[in-house]
Amino acid sequence: MPALREGLCAGALLATLGCLQPPPAAQGESTPPGDDADDAVLLAARGPGQLYAIGEVRGFELRQGGQRIGSSWGRYVGMDERGHHRFETRIELTFPGRAPARSSGELLLDGDGHLVEGFERSAAAELRFRRDGDSVVFTDGAQTDEVAYEPGRRPTAFMAHSAILHAELMFGLQGIVGREPAWRLISLSGGAPVEWSARVVERTPGNHHLRVQTSLGELVTLVDGRIAGIEVAATELSIVTIAAPTWPAFTIEAPRVLRWSRPADANFDVRELELPGPPDEPALAGELLIPKGAAGPVPAVLFVSGTGLEDRYGFAGPPPVDLGSHEITDALAQNGFAVLRFDDRGRGRSAPGPVGFLAQVDDAGRALATLAVQPEVDPDRIIVIAHGEGGLRGLLLATKRAGDVHALALLAVPGRPYEQVMRAQAEARIEALPPEIRERARAQQRTMLDDLVSGRAVPEELAPQAQWLREVFAVKPADLVGRVRVPMLLAQGDKDFEIDPVADVRALERAAKARGASLEVRRYPGLDHLFKPEPGASSPERYMVDRRVDDAFITDLLAWARRVTSPSPKPRRSRG
């Protein structure tokens, strides 16, 4: 469930328990004294009610490069009426210049320490899980997944992202038998299970003090069975206990659920559509907005969404964000246009599939072909309206399928090569960091992006992003805009932090002029990347604030669409 994993770990810039890191090379290990038998009990397993006093709080501070980057708390609440043991966690990760990222969790265990149910919640997403026979079922309310869970057949632990109490529970419930314990580790944050193992590299007589090197790269210090510290050399991460911790006051509300409802004065009908495609490609779903009372075929719009995965309404996330495209498409339908809007693969009712840039171009082509054969649509008056990076897909459609696209509207579209855009975005974020950590952050960012683009040292779970980047980096927007031979509109807000309102517009404008392409440019002071009013500085956090798409922008877009789709006297082409 990659969307859930993204949401629950959103903004986490550290690697800790539950987030995989390659183990560092083992050097200078001390040899544990005493009995090295494989069945020697170095830490006795105990039941969940024997590990903590009711209400006891455990607190941990997370540091990276010697600086505090967050805290993790956990506590034992006691037994409920069903005899299940309840544990709670709170996580707070801090980032310079940004609000803290907070999450909460709850865990119910039976008397044997086996998982019963629980949840992990952040402002981005809520993931609930429960044991069902030999499986753990995860759901975010829209998607459901399950992983095998058979603790009676093989030792199995469970852990949520940055929940250090869960790590302490893991050692307390499983115990340590022999120098190399091993068990299966289930992520409660939506990640894939992993095989976990460790080596006891140091211990004192009586095993009151143990140091354990794990296969995930952590060096864990246990004192009387409790975590006293964790070190991750590869990321300069350290975790230390907080003396006399108190339970944090913050709470996390369940994230909002975004839903579209037809406007009360809607003058259009809605018809569900499937977008036909090759049998080996995922099924795609969308809907056609059909103006009521239209006399004969009407002009039509295909809306192409921007970066990231969105549903047909422009709802993205986690965290749940209303990007506002439904306001644009509703207005077009309300004013006489048939509109096709569709779910990106893996969103809404569209099936998941590999998310490469070229695959997304093909998906837009499927939508265009589907729109053209609808009986209410005039195939000679189809325009494509594309937002953000979706504009690159729109440009490719307009050049490769010139006969099918009558006009093209580019809303906040990059004009420079996308690699330049991404690196500029990263540099802007780095400049907001404290001066003492900028160079390290800049080097880490450069290495990460270089590795993704080249395919070097790319974790399996990031392979799709690497493919997408390689494909989109090959696109030259300025070259494409010069080859388009239909009317184009370029709209740009001057509060956009994703696209440079000057450099990107200039690149497209100059290329169109040099090649004789028809490009009308409209600039909108005070509007952000989503064409919503922004009184201050735009940021990802500001996208979470409920705002409407600007009325004047929508009015201009409607006027342009009417003008470029005015009926022409040329013969109508056959649908065959």
Language model features with spans:
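Alpha/beta-hydrolase active-site loop
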Residues: 324, 354-375
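Catalytic active-site module of serine/aspartate enzymes centered on a nucleophile-bearing elbow/loop
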Residues: 530, 536-575
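Solvent-exposed helix/loop surface patches that form functional interfaces
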Residues: 36-42, 46, 51-57, 124-213
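N-terminal cap/lid segment of alpha/beta-hydrolase-fold proteins
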Residues: 255-296
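Conserved alpha/beta-hydrolase "acid-adjacent" motif
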Residues: 497-504
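Short beta-strand/loop motif that positions the catalytic acidic residue
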Residues: 484, 490-492
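Accessory cap/linker subdomain of secreted extracellular hydrolases
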Residues: 401, 407-483, 498
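Short, surface-exposed "cap/lid" segments of acyl-processing enzymes
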Residues: 293-331
